[in-house]
Protein backbone atom coordinates (compact mmCIF):
# COMPACT_ATOMS: atom_id res chain seq x y z
CA UNK A 1 0.00 0.00 0.00
CA UNK A 2 1.26 3.41 -0.92
CA UNK A 3 -1.60 5.70 0.12
CA UNK A 4 -4.53 5.16 2.47
CA UNK A 5 -7.45 7.61 2.41
CA UNK A 6 -9.35 7.59 5.71
CA UNK A 7 -12.58 9.60 5.71
CA UNK A 8 -14.56 10.13 8.91
CA UNK A 9 -18.20 11.06 8.31
CA UNK A 10 -18.64 12.92 11.58
CA UNK A 11 -21.59 11.48 13.57
CA UNK A 12 -22.83 9.03 10.89
CA UNK A 13 -23.66 6.20 13.31
CA UNK A 14 -25.38 2.92 12.42
CA UNK A 15 -27.24 1.73 15.52
CA UNK A 16 -27.15 1.85 19.30
CA UNK A 17 -24.30 0.14 21.16
CA UNK A 18 -25.23 -2.43 23.85
CA UNK A 19 -24.52 0.17 26.57
CA UNK A 20 -26.42 3.01 24.84
CA UNK A 21 -29.01 3.05 27.66
CA UNK A 22 -26.29 4.28 30.04
CA UNK A 23 -25.99 7.38 27.83
CA UNK A 24 -29.73 7.90 27.30
CA UNK A 25 -29.42 6.77 23.68
CA UNK A 26 -31.71 3.75 23.43
CA UNK A 27 -33.19 3.46 19.96
CA UNK A 28 -30.65 5.75 18.30
CA UNK A 29 -29.64 4.81 14.76
CA UNK A 30 -28.48 7.87 12.86
CA UNK A 31 -28.53 6.27 9.39
CA UNK A 32 -31.57 3.97 9.64
CA UNK A 33 -33.79 6.45 11.51
CA UNK A 34 -32.88 9.30 9.17
CA UNK A 35 -33.69 7.08 6.17
CA UNK A 36 -37.13 6.31 7.64
CA UNK A 37 -37.77 9.98 8.39
CA UNK A 38 -37.04 11.09 4.80
CA UNK A 39 -38.90 8.19 3.16
CA UNK A 40 -35.82 6.19 2.16
CA UNK A 41 -32.29 6.90 0.97
CA UNK A 42 -31.00 7.05 -2.57
CA UNK A 43 -27.22 6.76 -2.17
CA UNK A 44 -26.09 4.64 -5.14
CA UNK A 45 -22.35 4.80 -4.50
CA UNK A 46 -22.47 4.06 -0.77
CA UNK A 47 -24.93 1.29 -1.64
CA UNK A 48 -22.40 -0.25 -4.06
CA UNK A 49 -19.79 -0.20 -1.28
CA UNK A 50 -22.13 -2.24 0.91
CA UNK A 51 -23.69 0.30 3.29
CA UNK A 52 -27.07 -1.45 3.07
CA UNK A 53 -25.47 -4.79 3.94
CA UNK A 54 -24.26 -3.60 7.36
CA UNK A 55 -27.73 -2.86 8.73
CA UNK A 56 -31.15 -2.56 7.04
CA UNK A 57 -31.52 1.01 5.77
CA UNK A 58 -34.70 2.03 3.95
CA UNK A 59 -33.97 2.55 0.25
CA UNK A 60 -30.58 0.81 0.22
CA UNK A 61 -30.23 -2.72 -1.18
CA UNK A 62 -28.74 -5.30 1.16
CA UNK A 63 -28.61 -8.17 -1.34
CA UNK A 64 -25.93 -6.83 -3.67
CA UNK A 65 -22.30 -7.86 -4.14
CA UNK A 66 -20.34 -5.08 -2.42
CA UNK A 67 -17.39 -3.56 -4.31
CA UNK A 68 -15.18 -3.94 -1.23
CA UNK A 69 -15.42 -4.84 2.45
CA UNK A 70 -18.11 -3.75 4.89
CA UNK A 71 -18.88 -4.06 8.60
CA UNK A 72 -19.41 -2.00 11.72
CA UNK A 73 -17.28 -1.12 14.74
CA UNK A 74 -18.13 -0.74 18.42
CA UNK A 75 -16.50 1.83 20.68
CA UNK A 76 -14.43 0.48 23.58
CA UNK A 77 -13.71 3.86 25.16
CA UNK A 78 -16.38 5.35 27.41
CA UNK A 79 -17.95 8.42 25.82
CA UNK A 80 -19.51 9.47 22.54
CA UNK A 81 -17.59 12.53 21.42
CA UNK A 82 -15.38 13.51 18.51
CA UNK A 83 -12.08 13.38 20.37
CA UNK A 84 -12.72 9.98 21.97
CA UNK A 85 -13.90 8.52 18.65
CA UNK A 86 -11.02 9.81 16.54
CA UNK A 87 -8.41 8.87 19.13
CA UNK A 88 -9.80 5.31 19.24
CA UNK A 89 -9.80 5.09 15.42
CA UNK A 90 -6.10 5.95 15.70
CA UNK A 91 -5.39 3.30 18.34
CA UNK A 92 -5.87 5.11 21.65
CA UNK A 93 -8.57 3.73 23.97
CA UNK A 94 -9.53 5.86 26.96
CA UNK A 95 -9.88 4.18 30.36
CA UNK A 96 -12.19 6.85 31.77
CA UNK A 97 -14.37 9.40 30.03
CA UNK A 98 -13.52 13.07 29.72
CA UNK A 99 -15.33 15.14 32.41
CA UNK A 100 -18.79 16.51 31.61
CA UNK A 101 -20.68 19.35 33.26
CA UNK A 102 -24.47 18.84 33.26
CA UNK A 103 -24.83 21.70 35.78
CA UNK A 104 -22.26 24.05 34.24
CA UNK A 105 -18.64 24.58 35.28
CA UNK A 106 -17.59 25.11 38.93
CA UNK A 107 -17.75 28.75 40.03
CA UNK A 108 -14.08 28.88 41.04
CA UNK A 109 -13.07 27.71 37.54
CA UNK A 110 -15.24 30.36 35.86
CA UNK A 111 -13.86 33.00 38.25
CA UNK A 112 -10.26 32.09 37.34
CA UNK A 113 -11.17 32.22 33.64
CA UNK A 114 -12.82 35.64 34.03
CA UNK A 115 -9.78 36.99 35.87
CA UNK A 116 -7.46 35.65 33.16
CA UNK A 117 -9.42 37.25 30.29
CA UNK A 118 -10.31 40.46 32.16
CA UNK A 119 -14.06 40.17 31.50
CA UNK A 120 -17.10 38.60 33.10
CA UNK A 121 -18.90 35.78 31.26
CA UNK A 122 -22.50 34.87 30.44
CA UNK A 123 -24.20 31.48 30.40
CA UNK A 124 -22.22 28.73 32.11
CA UNK A 125 -24.73 25.97 31.44
CA UNK A 126 -25.34 23.14 28.99
CA UNK A 127 -27.13 24.41 25.89
CA UNK A 128 -27.60 24.06 22.17
CA UNK A 129 -25.17 26.43 20.46
CA UNK A 130 -27.81 28.06 18.29
CA UNK A 131 -30.28 28.38 21.21
CA UNK A 132 -27.80 30.03 23.57
CA UNK A 133 -26.79 32.75 21.12
CA UNK A 134 -30.48 33.50 20.56
CA UNK A 135 -30.97 33.70 24.32
CA UNK A 136 -27.84 35.63 25.32
CA UNK A 137 -26.54 37.16 22.07
CA UNK A 138 -28.14 40.55 22.63
CA UNK A 139 -26.83 40.80 26.22
CA UNK A 140 -23.40 39.73 24.95
CA UNK A 141 -23.44 42.53 22.35
CA UNK A 142 -24.42 45.04 25.02
CA UNK A 143 -21.87 43.95 27.66
CA UNK A 144 -19.01 42.47 25.64
CA UNK A 145 -19.05 39.41 27.92
CA UNK A 146 -18.33 36.12 26.10
CA UNK A 147 -20.92 33.32 26.35
CA UNK A 148 -19.57 30.17 28.01
CA UNK A 149 -21.54 26.95 27.66
CA UNK A 150 -21.17 23.18 27.44
CA UNK A 151 -23.18 20.21 26.14
CA UNK A 152 -23.56 16.52 26.96
CA UNK A 153 -20.01 16.20 25.60
CA UNK A 154 -16.78 17.14 27.33
CA UNK A 155 -16.53 20.65 25.87
CA UNK A 156 -15.92 24.20 27.11
CA UNK A 157 -17.42 26.40 24.39
CA UNK A 158 -17.00 30.14 24.05
CA UNK A 159 -19.40 32.00 21.76
CA UNK A 160 -18.78 35.60 20.72
CA UNK A 161 -20.02 37.97 18.01
CA UNK A 162 -17.18 38.65 15.57
CA UNK A 163 -17.82 42.42 15.75
CA UNK A 164 -17.83 42.43 19.57
CA UNK A 165 -14.86 40.15 20.27
CA UNK A 166 -12.55 39.87 17.25
CA UNK A 167 -11.59 36.34 16.19
CA UNK A 168 -7.99 36.59 17.36
CA UNK A 169 -9.13 37.68 20.81
CA UNK A 170 -11.68 34.86 20.96
CA UNK A 171 -8.98 32.35 19.99
CA UNK A 172 -6.72 33.79 22.69
CA UNK A 173 -9.51 33.31 25.26
CA UNK A 174 -9.82 29.68 24.15
CA UNK A 175 -6.07 29.14 24.61
CA UNK A 176 -6.34 30.63 28.12
CA UNK A 177 -9.25 28.27 28.90
CA UNK A 178 -7.31 25.31 27.51
CA UNK A 179 -4.45 26.18 29.88
CA UNK A 180 -6.82 26.25 32.87
CA UNK A 181 -8.71 23.07 31.98
CA UNK A 182 -6.27 20.45 33.21
CA UNK A 183 -6.26 17.69 35.83
CA UNK A 184 -9.80 16.85 36.98
CA UNK A 185 -11.16 19.50 34.59
CA UNK A 186 -9.24 18.28 31.51
CA UNK A 187 -12.15 18.57 29.06
CA UNK A 188 -11.77 16.96 25.66
CA UNK A 189 -12.09 20.20 23.73
CA UNK A 190 -12.28 23.95 24.12
CA UNK A 191 -14.22 25.34 21.14
CA UNK A 192 -14.37 28.87 19.74
CA UNK A 193 -17.92 29.49 18.47
CA UNK A 194 -17.97 32.83 16.62
CA UNK A 195 -21.21 34.22 15.22
CA UNK A 196 -22.47 37.26 13.30
CA UNK A 197 -25.82 38.95 12.65
CA UNK A 198 -28.36 40.87 14.70
CA UNK A 199 -30.74 39.88 17.54
CA UNK A 200 -33.29 37.42 16.20
CA UNK A 201 -31.05 36.69 13.22
CA UNK A 202 -27.72 35.42 14.60
CA UNK A 203 -25.71 32.95 12.53
CA UNK A 204 -22.68 30.89 13.54
CA UNK A 205 -19.73 31.29 11.18
CA UNK A 206 -17.21 28.83 9.75
CA UNK A 207 -14.44 30.37 11.90
CA UNK A 208 -14.94 27.78 14.62
CA UNK A 209 -11.69 26.51 16.12
CA UNK A 210 -11.16 23.50 18.39
CA UNK A 211 -8.45 23.22 21.04
CA UNK A 212 -8.13 19.57 21.92
CA UNK A 213 -6.18 17.92 24.68
CA UNK A 214 -2.99 16.40 23.35
CA UNK A 215 -3.43 12.63 22.89
CA UNK A 216 -2.56 10.81 26.12
CA UNK A 217 -0.57 8.12 24.31
CA UNK A 218 1.01 7.28 20.96
CA UNK A 219 -1.40 7.13 18.01
CA UNK A 220 -0.93 5.51 14.61
CA UNK A 221 -0.41 9.07 13.28
CA UNK A 222 2.64 9.47 15.53
CA UNK A 223 3.97 6.08 14.40
CA UNK A 224 3.54 6.94 10.71
CA UNK A 225 5.40 10.24 11.07
CA UNK A 226 8.19 8.62 13.12
CA UNK A 227 8.75 6.13 10.29
CA UNK A 228 8.95 8.88 7.67
CA UNK A 229 5.48 8.57 6.15
CA UNK A 230 3.35 11.57 5.29
CA UNK A 231 0.14 12.24 7.23
CA UNK A 232 -2.10 14.83 5.57
CA UNK A 233 -5.00 16.15 7.66
CA UNK A 234 -8.10 17.75 6.12
CA UNK A 235 -10.74 19.48 8.25
CA UNK A 236 -10.81 19.16 12.05
CA UNK A 237 -8.04 16.52 12.18
CA UNK A 238 -5.34 19.01 13.23
CA UNK A 239 -7.52 20.31 16.08
CA UNK A 240 -8.60 16.86 17.29
CA UNK A 241 -5.00 15.68 17.69
CA UNK A 242 -3.68 19.06 18.90
CA UNK A 243 -1.46 19.16 15.81
CA UNK A 244 0.36 15.95 16.69
CA UNK A 245 1.22 13.27 14.15
CA UNK A 246 0.63 15.38 11.04
CA UNK A 247 3.08 16.47 8.36
CA UNK A 248 0.58 18.81 6.64
CA UNK A 249 -2.92 20.04 7.33
CA UNK A 250 -5.62 22.28 5.92
CA UNK A 251 -8.86 23.38 7.57
CA UNK A 252 -12.16 23.41 5.69
CA UNK A 253 -15.20 25.70 5.43
CA UNK A 254 -17.74 22.89 5.00
CA UNK A 255 -18.13 19.31 3.75
CA UNK A 256 -17.88 20.22 0.08
CA UNK A 257 -14.66 22.16 0.70
CA UNK A 258 -13.28 19.08 2.49
CA UNK A 259 -14.30 16.79 -0.36
CA UNK A 260 -12.76 19.05 -3.01
CA UNK A 261 -9.52 19.26 -1.01
CA UNK A 262 -9.47 15.47 -0.57
CA UNK A 263 -9.92 14.87 -4.31
CA UNK A 264 -7.22 17.44 -5.15
CA UNK A 265 -4.75 15.83 -2.74
CA UNK A 266 -5.15 12.52 -4.58
CA UNK A 267 -3.42 14.13 -7.57
CA UNK A 268 -0.34 14.45 -5.33
CA UNK A 269 2.33 11.82 -5.07
CA UNK A 270 2.79 10.87 -1.41
CA UNK A 271 3.27 7.75 0.67
CA UNK A 272 1.23 7.55 3.84
CA UNK A 273 -2.19 8.61 5.10
CA UNK A 274 -4.72 11.20 3.91
CA UNK A 275 -7.09 11.72 6.86
CA UNK A 276 -10.28 13.76 6.30
CA UNK A 277 -13.03 14.74 8.72
CA UNK A 278 -16.36 15.92 7.30
CA UNK A 279 -18.06 17.77 10.16
CA UNK A 280 -21.28 19.15 8.64
CA UNK A 281 -23.28 15.95 9.25
CA UNK A 282 -22.79 16.56 12.97
CA UNK A 283 -22.39 20.31 13.39
CA UNK A 284 -24.91 21.62 10.86
CA UNK A 285 -27.56 18.88 10.80
CA UNK A 286 -27.26 16.31 13.61
CA UNK A 287 -27.19 18.73 16.52
CA UNK A 288 -30.05 20.70 14.98
CA UNK A 289 -32.21 17.60 14.47
CA UNK A 290 -32.44 18.37 10.75
CA UNK A 291 -32.99 14.94 9.17
CA UNK A 292 -33.64 16.35 5.68
CA UNK A 293 -30.42 18.37 5.77
CA UNK A 294 -28.55 15.31 7.05
CA UNK A 295 -29.78 13.32 4.06
CA UNK A 296 -28.79 16.13 1.66
CA UNK A 297 -25.26 16.03 3.14
CA UNK A 298 -25.14 12.25 2.66
CA UNK A 299 -26.24 12.69 -0.98
CA UNK A 300 -23.52 15.28 -1.50
CA UNK A 301 -20.89 12.90 -0.10
CA UNK A 302 -22.27 10.08 -2.24
CA UNK A 303 -21.95 12.25 -5.36
CA UNK A 304 -18.25 12.87 -4.62
CA UNK A 305 -17.44 9.21 -3.96
CA UNK A 306 -16.81 8.29 -7.64
CA UNK A 307 -14.39 11.23 -7.95
CA UNK A 308 -12.43 9.89 -4.98
CA UNK A 309 -12.61 6.24 -6.10
CA UNK A 310 -11.44 6.94 -9.64
CA UNK A 311 -8.36 8.77 -8.33
CA UNK A 312 -7.24 5.71 -6.35
CA UNK A 313 -4.18 4.04 -7.79
CA UNK A 314 -3.54 0.30 -7.89
CA UNK A 315 -1.95 0.29 -4.42
CA UNK A 316 -4.27 2.79 -2.68
CA UNK A 317 -6.94 2.04 -0.10
CA UNK A 318 -10.09 3.96 0.90
CA UNK A 319 -11.60 3.54 4.39
CA UNK A 320 -14.88 5.28 5.29
CA UNK A 321 -16.12 5.31 8.88
CA UNK A 322 -17.52 7.60 11.62
CA UNK A 323 -16.65 8.66 15.17
CA UNK A 324 -20.04 8.44 16.98
CA UNK A 325 -23.71 9.02 16.21
CA UNK A 326 -25.93 12.12 16.31
CA UNK A 327 -29.41 10.88 15.44
CA UNK A 328 -31.40 13.87 14.11
CA UNK A 329 -34.72 12.07 14.65
CA UNK A 330 -34.53 11.75 18.46
CA UNK A 331 -35.55 14.51 20.92
CA UNK A 332 -31.91 14.86 22.02
CA UNK A 333 -29.71 17.36 20.17
CA UNK A 334 -26.54 15.65 21.47
CA UNK A 335 -24.34 12.85 20.16
CA UNK A 336 -25.54 9.26 20.42
CA UNK A 337 -23.59 6.18 21.53
CA UNK A 338 -23.63 4.07 18.36
CA UNK A 339 -21.79 1.59 16.22
CA UNK A 340 -20.06 3.20 13.24
CA UNK A 341 -20.04 1.89 9.67
CA UNK A 342 -16.85 0.51 8.14
CA UNK A 343 -16.52 0.56 4.35
CA UNK A 344 -13.25 -0.37 2.63
CA UNK A 345 -12.45 -0.15 -1.09
CA UNK A 346 -9.38 -0.51 -3.27
CA UNK A 347 -8.15 -2.20 -6.45
CA UNK A 348 -6.01 -4.64 -4.48
CA UNK A 349 -8.68 -5.87 -2.04
CA UNK A 350 -11.33 -8.56 -2.37
CA UNK A 351 -14.95 -7.76 -3.14
CA UNK A 352 -17.94 -8.44 -0.90
CA UNK A 353 -16.05 -9.22 2.31
CA UNK A 354 -18.16 -9.07 5.48
CA UNK A 355 -15.91 -7.73 8.25
CA UNK A 356 -18.66 -8.32 10.81
CA UNK A 357 -18.91 -6.40 14.07
CA UNK A 358 -15.51 -5.19 15.22
CA UNK A 359 -14.90 -4.81 18.96
CA UNK A 360 -13.16 -1.46 18.69
CA UNK A 361 -12.62 1.47 16.34
CA UNK A 362 -8.90 0.76 16.92
CA UNK A 363 -9.10 -2.04 14.33
CA UNK A 364 -8.57 0.76 11.78
CA UNK A 365 -5.27 1.72 13.47
CA UNK A 366 -4.22 -1.94 13.66
CA UNK A 367 -4.89 -2.31 9.92
CA UNK A 368 -2.82 0.79 9.11
CA UNK A 369 -0.02 -0.55 11.33
CA UNK A 370 0.03 -3.83 9.40
CA UNK A 371 -0.15 -2.14 6.00
CA UNK A 372 2.73 0.25 6.73
CA UNK A 373 4.83 -2.16 8.80
CA UNK A 374 4.51 -0.22 12.06
CA UNK A 375 4.82 -1.42 15.64
CA UNK A 376 1.45 -3.07 16.43
CA UNK A 377 -0.80 -1.55 19.08
CA UNK A 378 -4.27 -2.51 20.25
CA UNK A 379 -7.04 -3.64 17.93
CA UNK A 380 -7.26 -6.42 15.34
CA UNK A 381 -6.11 -5.72 11.80
CA UNK A 382 -8.55 -6.69 9.05
CA UNK A 383 -5.89 -6.40 6.34
CA UNK A 384 -5.48 -10.19 6.11
CA UNK A 385 -9.23 -10.59 5.56
CA UNK A 386 -9.44 -8.18 2.64
CA UNK A 387 -6.17 -8.27 0.70
CA UNK A 388 -6.17 -10.21 -2.57
Curated annotation (Swiss-Prot):
It holds the Pfam family Metalloenzyme. This is Phosphopentomutase. Isomerase that catalyzes the conversion of deoxy-ribose 1-phosphate (dRib-1-P) and ribose 1-phosphate (Rib-1-P) to deoxy-ribose 5-phosphate (dRib-5-P) and ribose 5-phosphate (Rib-5-P), respectively. It catalyses: 2-deoxy-alpha-D-ribose 1-phosphate = 2-deoxy-D-ribose 5-phosphate; alpha-D-ribose 1-phosphate = D-ribose 5-phosphate. One of its GO terms (molecular function) is manganese ion binding. It is an enzyme of class 5 (isomerase). Mn(2+) 1 binds at residues 10, 323-324. Mn(2+) 2 binds at residues 282, 287, 335. GO terms for biological process: 2-deoxyribose 1-phosphate catabolic process; 5-phosphoribose 1-diphosphate biosynthetic process; metabolic compound salvage; nucleotide metabolic process. The gene is deoB. Binds 2 manganese ions. It is found in: Cytoplasm. HAMAP family: Phosphopentomut (MF_00740). It comes from the Bacteria. It comes from Carboxydothermus hydrogenoformans (strain ATCC BAA-161 / DSM 6008 / Z-2901). Its EC number is 5.4.2.7. CDD domains: PPM. Pathway: Carbohydrate degradation; 2-deoxy-D-ribose 1-phosphate degradation; D-glyceraldehyde 3-phosphate and acetaldehyde from 2-deoxy-alpha-D-ribose 1-phosphate: step 1/2. Belongs to the phosphopentomutase family. GO terms for cellular component: cytosol.
Amino acid sequence: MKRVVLIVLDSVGIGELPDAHLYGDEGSNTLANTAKKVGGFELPNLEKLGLGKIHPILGLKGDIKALGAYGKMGEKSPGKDTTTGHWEICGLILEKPFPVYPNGFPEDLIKRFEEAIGRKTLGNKPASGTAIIEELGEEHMRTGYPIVYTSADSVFQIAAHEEVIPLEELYKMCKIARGLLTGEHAVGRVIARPFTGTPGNFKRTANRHDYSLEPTGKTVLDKLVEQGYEVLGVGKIYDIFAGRGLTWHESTKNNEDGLVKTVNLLYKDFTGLLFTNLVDFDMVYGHRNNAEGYYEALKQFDSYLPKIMEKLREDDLLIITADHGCDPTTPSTDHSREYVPLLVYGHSIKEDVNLGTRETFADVAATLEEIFGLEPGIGQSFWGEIRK
